[in-house]
């Protein structure tokens, strides 16, 4: 085999289609776009959400509900997490929860929920508590303080 014997794989050297270059080219006049209509135009894209002119689904369905601007979104922490991550008589604060990667950010505050058991006395400082969480913290000899 010599260098001049090398040939590209059949089908690898496809000619590009030159459109709009006269009737003899096979792609003249309308350039393969057919006659008139939106898709024959220069910027003739039909957007993916277009439904052919009928009223789109999102406008046919009624509006429902609203977003409450006063809603508080709390970062929630369960009592069982405090049991695992804190020693007895330790103070639990939002800063310590972020530092120990129990929560990512404060949001509108921290709410302690009562899932799991608590055996160690802890001083827990948070923005909100569930009733069951307060009961479990106080029955373990700890204190629940709202900040």
Curated annotation (Swiss-Prot):
Keywords: Ribonucleoprotein, Ribosomal protein, RNA-binding, rRNA-binding
Biological process per Gene Ontology, one example term: translation
Keyword Ribonucleoprotein annotated: yes
GO molecular function: rRNA binding; structural constituent of ribosome
InterPro entries xref list: Ribosomal_uL15 (IPR030878), Ribosomal_uL15/eL18 (IPR021131), Ribosomal_uL15/eL18_sf (IPR036227), Ribosomal_uL15_bac-type (IPR005749), Ribosomal_uL15_CS (IPR001196)
GO annotations of cellular component type: cytosolic large ribosomal subunit
Biased composition annotated in UniProt, kind: Basic residues: 30-44
Coiled coil: none
Quaternary structure note: Part of the 50S ribosomal subunit.
Function: Binds to the 23S rRNA.
Protein family membership: Belongs to the universal ribosomal protein uL15 family.
Record-given protein name: Large ribosomal subunit protein uL15
The species this protein was found in: Thermotoga petrophila (strain ATCC BAA-488 / DSM 13995 / JCM 10881 / RKU-1)
């Amino acid at each position: 085999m010599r260098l001049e014997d090398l040939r590209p794989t059949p089908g690898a050297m496809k000619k590009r289609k030159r459109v709009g270059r006269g009737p003899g080219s096979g792609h003249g006049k309308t350039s393969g776009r057919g006659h008139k209509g939106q898709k024959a135009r220069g910027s003739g894209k039909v957007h993916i959400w277009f439904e052919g002119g009928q009223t789109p689904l999102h406008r046919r369905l009624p509006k429902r509900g609203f977003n409450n601007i006063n809603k508080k979104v709390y970062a929630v922490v369960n009592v069982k997490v405090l049991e695992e991550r804190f020693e007895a008589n330790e103070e639990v604060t939002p800063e310590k929860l972020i530092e120990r990667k129990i929560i990512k950010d404060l949001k509108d505050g921290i709410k302690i929920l009562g899932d799991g058991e608590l055996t160690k006395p802890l001083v827990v400082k948070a923005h909100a508590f569930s009733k069951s969480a307060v009961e479990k913290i106080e029955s373990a000899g700890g204190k629940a303080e709202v900040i």
